[in-house]
Amino acid sequence: MAESDSTDFDLLWYLENLSDKEFQSFKKYLARKILDFKLPQFPLIQMTKEELANVLPISYEGQYIWNMLFSIFSMMRKEDLCRKIIGRRNRNQEACKAVMRRKFMLQWESHTFGKFHYKFFRDVSSDVFYILQLAYDSTSYYSANNLNVFLMGERASGKTIVINLAVLRWIKGEMWQNMISYVVHLTAHEINQMTNSSLAELIAKDWPDGQAPIADILSDPKKLLFILEDLDNIRFELNVNESALCSNSTQKVPIPVLLVSLLKRKMAPGCWFLISSRPTRGNNVKTFLKEVDCCTTLQLSNGKREIYFNSFFKDRQRASAALQLVHEDEILVGLCRVAILCWITCTVLKRQMDKGRDFQLCCQTPTDLHAHFLADALTSEAGLTANQYHLGLLKRLCLLAAGGLFLSTLNFSGEDLRCVGFTEADVSVLQAANILLPSNTHKDRYKFIHLNVQEFCTAIAFLMAVPNYLIPSGSREYKEKREQYSDFNQVFTFIFGLLNANRRKILETSFGYQLPMVDSFKWYSVGYMKHLDRDPEKLTHHMPLFYCLYENREEEFVKTIVDALMEVTVYLQSDKDMMVSLYCLDYCCHLRTLKLSVQRIFQNKEPLIRPTASQMKSLVYWREICSLFYTMESLRELHIFDNDLNGISERILSKALEHSSCKLRTLKLSYVSTASGFEDLLKALARNRSLTYLSINCTSISLNMFSLLHDILHEPTCQISHLSLMKCDLRASECEEIASLLISGGSLRKLTLSSNPLRSDGMNILCDALLHPNCTLISLVLVFCCLTENCCSALGRVLLFSPTLRQLDLCVNRLKNYGVLHVTFPLLFPTCQLEELHLSGCFFSSDICQYIAIVIATNEKLRSLEIGSNKIEDAGMQLLCGGLRHPNCMLVNIGLEECMLTSACCRSLASVLTTNKTLERLNLLQNHLGNDGVAKLLESLISPDCVLKVVGLPLTGLNTQTQQLLMTVKERKPSLIFLSETWSLKEGREIGVTPASQPGSIIPNSNLDYMFFKFPRMSAAMRTSNTASRQPL
């Protein structure tokens, strides 16, 4: 890195100001300093001043050289030279402020909302500035070594403005005095354009001609602040191996290596970071957010929102009326947490007030607000009514918006604008209307005032007959350097909003144009929802759909859409989510199963004395949600997962579950924590007269909970017949408590204990209880309980003598041949009542199959046998077929998935299909049967002697002849069902829903995009949606 050519950085000039005697002393001091700084040594004694001045810069980094020189000059009392270095450093600090002042010229000052926001954030951000002041003060309790300060906030929430204001305050001497000497500003966009760089080059990028005083900037890293904006938008992962990190500020390295070296302080140790990001907290954010770091969130609180409205309207009465409208709807509250969206809302409401319109009727949803914003901005110029020019402007704007989103482009070049037909005059109109503005992160580019406006225009494009178009910035060569956009849920929401005739009328009346695709999409969506249950790509959860319906709010249309829903999954993370879900669930007249997750709403929010207004609002919504459990006539199953309930919210849930009108038959609780340790909840269930299935999974079961469960099951009126305690970390020490449940003499008929490390010791305790005369258990599920052959003798006794046990599931336990022999041997005796035995994944081989075949041939009670994922092989299958062909075999189901079978056993299997008159279900998935083997089985399936109703066959890779035979089977036996799932996916094998609040997990994609992207209007555009050449609408 070239430094200034003045004497400020001229080493020789400094050395020549030393006498010969002083120079000799200097070299001795320098040798010691090199050792102190732990730098590589070289011979100094014989060097001249010129030689030393030439050698130092190629041997050491500049900051080390000048720090050593300053220290030596101080020890030598060369005050004139020290003053010169101090003066240079002071000038460079001022020069840095000048560089930052130029860079932070506030672009928004040229726009109405920009000036307004500058003043607003300056007035209301004192709390953030206070945190930033303390965080970088090494003497403050708030500070820590190598501190990162994270400024979190949604898109356009004011993060950039607050950062700019903080830097301007530093420039003016109002912040970080004697704490920060230099600021280096980086944005995700700048970083995404780079491939390799040195730290010196990175620092110098904003300085005139790239000439920065690197030595002075890095001389004291503890006074150096790096500002990194939009960490979540960096296009590459920062999971760099420690061994690849670099400490040399002049060495060029890949950008990920450089950033991680900085963030982990391998470079510039002791420096500070101010990082902005959206609260989604992507992988890069989670990688670097440490416990000691400071994290503050930017959003407009109720108090700040009130200040905003009062400042905007300058009329308290109008501001109060506008605020009341916003506060009546959580969607609008959420919208107005973001400053620019708040500005759009206020702008629209003010225009409606100025026109004397009833704004409370015409501005109820974001669709209303965005429609009014676009219509007013594009058609109100000089009082003109809409004409073809305005309509053309709207169409081109929507084409640009849609083309941008489908190609992950949010910042548009001049070429992009020209390609969709915009002239310079058009751009000036859009800029004056505050729709399209110069980008504050991408030089010489434009962007929509907010992503929501681009999404709204994309929704209009969806319902317009606009052509497909590839904007230049969306081409493959820019793929790695542009933003990521993949969540189209807001676009879908706006589309549904525009399906409402009243909301659509705002645009259609203003522009004199009707959106041509409305009716076709409306009826398409109704048909799609009616067939949703038959679609393998059906919705995984319903929140995005519910937001769409809430935005629409046409009662008959909403009813029609949700009428077919019998199962709904909702993730509730805010009051807004609860409000929207309540609205839609109220129309779900045929709902039988509700799966519910409540995250972060009540977590760690136990009121100290009485609930705050905000907490009360959440509790009111929660009470309404819970009331559905006893007011929905059709609701029979409730799954609550990934929930953190405080005391009040748990009591509200408990009251609903004990309500006399509650008709729930099934209650499943997974990853649920409660303030009372489930005491309130379980006491409520004791008073529930309809519940037959209780599942408490993925939860620690305390002794008190066992006691409460015992009391519930002992209640004469208790109807619970199936209790599931999967993945609750139950061990042998808890088996005495489980045993007490078994002998309680109550209603319990089925117990599921899967995925608990009971081990053989625990199983032996349970076996004693299973033989107790009070035990009336019919079904026991012990999948993956760490059982071995050591407990199988005890299990055998249970099977031999239990008068009630009919079903036993021991899948995924290491029983081996010895254990399986002990478990199956009792089935040869008439006292054994077992009807279903599941031994999949129990590590036995074909050697034991002769004994299983005898059981199959002699036990007339056995109806179901699951032995998949064992090493049965063709030899074992031949033996089993002998048992299956025996006239005394009464099996209805046999599971043989993943048993290492080949075509060699298929002739015997085929004969079973035509001779066995009871077998209705056979699963052979994940076996390599080949074309010949599958063909033999298909030929038997055609036979009228075959009574099979359900079959699982490996059908991939079949040749044409076998595929034709398969089609023949399906034609002749249309009722025959072909399975696609194995034993591991059956009911009772699942562990529970992975909690979205756990680190590294997120709410899954809902698959709502399938409905939109399968719509014929979209198919051409989205056919290549996951490729670099994705086409826009």
From Swiss-Prot:
Q: Which PROSITE patterns match?
A: DAPIN (PS50824), NACHT (PS50837)
Q: Name one GO cellular component term.
A: cytoplasm
* UniProt repeat feature LRR, residue ranges: 588-611, 632-655, 745-768, 802-827, 859-882, 919-944
A GO molecular function held by the record: oxidoreductase activity, acting on paired donors, with incorporation or reduction of molecular oxygen, reduced ascorbate as one donor, and incorporation of one atom of oxygen
Gene3D superfamilies documented for this protein: Death Domain, Fas, P-loop containing nucleotide triphosphate hydrolases, Ribonuclease Inhibitor
Which UniProt keyword terms apply here? ATP-binding, Leucine-rich repeat, Nucleotide-binding, Repeat
Q: The organism sits in which domain of life?
A: Eukaryota
Which residues does the UniProt record annotate as the domain Pyrin? 1-91
Domain NACHT: start-end pairs: 147-470
In terms of Pfam families, this protein maps to:
LRR_6, NACHT, NLRC4_HD2, NOD2_WH, PYRIN
Question: Looking at the keywords, is Nucleotide-binding present?
Answer: yes
Q: What does this protein do?
A: Involved in inflammation.
Describe the family membership recorded for this protein in Swiss-Prot or TrEMBL.
Belongs to the NLRP family.
Q: What is this protein called?
A: NACHT, LRR and PYD domains-containing protein 11
